[in-house]
Amino acid sequence: MEFYKNGNGAVESFCEGHDPLNWNMAAESLKGSHVDELKRMVSDYRKPVVKLGGETLTIGQVAAIASHDGGVRVELSEEKRAGVKASSDWVMDSMGKGTDSYGVTTGFGATSHRRTKNGGALQRELIRFLNAGIFGSSLDSTHKLPHTATRAAMLVRFNTLLQGYSGIRFEILEAITKFLNGNITPCLPLRGTITASGDLVPLSYIAGLLIGRPNSKSVGPKGETLSPAEGFKLAGIDGGFFELQPKEGLALVNGTAVGSGMASMVLFDANTLAVLSEVMSAIFAEVMQGKPEFTDHLTHKLKHHPGQIEAAAIMEHILEGSSYVKEAKKVHEMDPLQKPKQDRYALRTSPQWLGPQIEVIRAATKMIEREINSVNDNPLIDVSRNKALHGGNFQELPIGVAMDNTRLAIASIGKLIFAQFSELVNDYYNNGLPSILTGSSNPSLDYGFKGAEIAMASYCSELQFLANPVTNHVQSAEQHNQDVNSLGLISSRKTSEAVDILKLMSSTFLVALCQAIDLRHLEENLKIVVKTTVSNVAKRTLTVSPNGELHPSRFSEKDLLTVVDREYLFSYIDDPCLATYPLMQKLRAELVEHALKNGERERSANTSIFHKIAAFEEELKTILPKEVDNARIEIENGKSEIPNRIKECRSYPLYRFVREELGTSLLTGEKIKSPGEECYKVFNAICAGKLVDPLLECLKEWNGAPLPIS
């Protein structure tokens, strides 16, 4: 990319000779993998200083300033001072010459036919009439913009103003910087902007604070409400409130920073949740004993879509060498003609489902990243050509469209998570896991994830409703001057709500996946106990005579062990010797089958197999329940014979984080802890950004490419 300096001292991030329409720049920005892009965002997020120059602000930096409450500092590029001053001086010179300029000597919007020579008073009136927001009572925060979104808006707005096209003094930008670095946040109304001619109403409250309007409050570092004077003092801004010069009020409010600032925060989370959904889909395949061929690169290469190819490659990487996949292969080889040939859509087509959502979120991210580095004022002050340009860069369809599209993608991700969760808790589909992931020995007093499944349906329903677009609900405003408008902030707000719901769904699903992992561990260890006990009892009652000699009609217990292998453990393990449960029924059927083949020998009590069935069953009923109970206690105390397979998988960092760092555990009816308490821990961790490191650790060995086709 080539750069040049314009007359305002700003550096342009495009070259008219080589890329006049900016398509190449847009395409270049999408190079590399989505995971690499997330890593860059996280790296930007964790830097202690954000150096602003007007053209290089990133999504990660906006998210950092928004959420760190002063822990990350902002520094303005001193090189920009001259360009900013030049545009400010141009406005003053123009007014001194009697030039008629919009927003300087004229009214605003549909009333721009009005004229005045009192430029300062005009700016004050602009701020006054735009202070039209409603905050509600002091105890009610539902009508206030979240302080994180306000911090994001402040950062984005003065990044735009730094480019030197807005006609505002550098000192005002320095004052806003002091507010940010001092963690002093203006109070902005949540509603009241259509994000065309910018976010006029909310931004007017930042301007109101700068000029000392009594109704413009701010919140201090400890959450205390501050008057304008208290805010200035705490921020260390000397010289008192600002007397706005001509154009400066318009420069402060005529921007899209509130919508694009919130969009930046939303997209930082959306990108993280998108990668999380890919990894969780792979874990879902592991615990469901899925067939990994759905990730084969040839399938996805033939479809050509990069999002799908990357989603499949990520899942392929997680599943490569997975201990669960190796074990599942043995399961699938047993009676293959009696099992489905392929997995259901929620597993098998997860790369095809998630791929387009990744592409949409990436495209939206780049669109918003361009937006937060753009100039949105009207008019634009072009010092080099000695003119003010009247246009419409405040028309923020990039925000509205990007957020509508992102919200639809988020809803689609949520729909897949819900489908996967529904299969996971349903014993008709989940390949042997207990119904609703019941973890205790008494399912009649343990209903596992039944409540969580109901909650997931609620989350998913609300999320699908939020997927509806905002931008098709435009109303003509401001005396039909603003007859089309973007609704960018409204769309950003709704997408923020959608992201929050997806966090709830992801938290619940992740807790359920960890429950399933532990249940597979329990299943494997208890099956060893069942097989060992059946084998020993069979040897004593079916193979050896009372005198210690081999029984004339003995048969190997191997066939009985095959019965145990074929039967889902959780279909009988709560009462393993119950006559109506499948284990005892099928063991008896196997013995009867052998007895029928025994022919004439069944007539003699010494050689009959049939006569020994009762003895076999009686001894098994005496021993097996005790052995199972003892094994459960040992496993709960961490003394299992077989270690948890998850430790041999690339998905282990996420499991370890949820279980060890967050302190969650296997949920059972005997324990007091509820599913919601465990989901809350994961939800809080996601909101605090703590899940990013274990998530990326799952992919630390991935080289950014699918496995070679072999």
Curated annotation (Swiss-Prot):
An example Gene Ontology molecular-function term: phenylalanine ammonia-lyase activity
BP GO annotations: cinnamic acid biosynthetic process; L-phenylalanine catabolic process
EC primary class: lyase
InterPro entries reported for this sequence: Aromatic_Lyase, Fumarase/histidase_N, L-Aspartase-like, Phe/His_NH3-lyase_AS, Phe_NH3-lyase, Phe_NH3-lyase_shielding_dom_sf
Enzyme Commission identifier(s): 4.3.1.24
Catalysed transformations (reactions): L-phenylalanine = (E)-cinnamate + NH4(+)
PTM entry text: Contains an active site 4-methylidene-imidazol-5-one (MIO), which is formed autocatalytically by cyclization and dehydration of residues Ala-Ser-Gly.
Subcellular location: Cytoplasm
Residue(s) of cross-link: 5-imidazolinone (Ala-Gly): A196-G198
Protein origin, superkingdom: Eukaryota
CDD domains in the cross-refs: PAL-HAL (cd00332)
Modified residues (2,3-didehydroalanine (Ser)): S197
Keyword flag Lyase: yes
Keywords: Cytoplasm, Lyase, Phenylalanine catabolism, Phenylpropanoid metabolism
Pathway terms, separated by semicolons: Phenylpropanoid metabolism; trans-cinnamate biosynthesis; trans-cinnamate from L-phenylalanine: step 1/1
Keyword flag Lyase: yes
Active-site feature positions: Y102 (proton donor/acceptor)
Gene Ontology cellular-component annotations: cytoplasm
Binding locations of (E)-cinnamate: N254, Q342, R348, N378, K450, E478, N481
Similarity-based family: Belongs to the PAL/histidase family.
Subunit structure and binding partners: Homotetramer.
Described purpose of this protein according to its UniProt entry: This is a key enzyme of plant metabolism catalyzing the first reaction in the biosynthesis from L-phenylalanine of a wide variety of natural products based on the phenylpropane skeleton.
Protein name as annotated: Phenylalanine ammonia-lyase 1
Species this protein is from: Rubus idaeus (Raspberry)
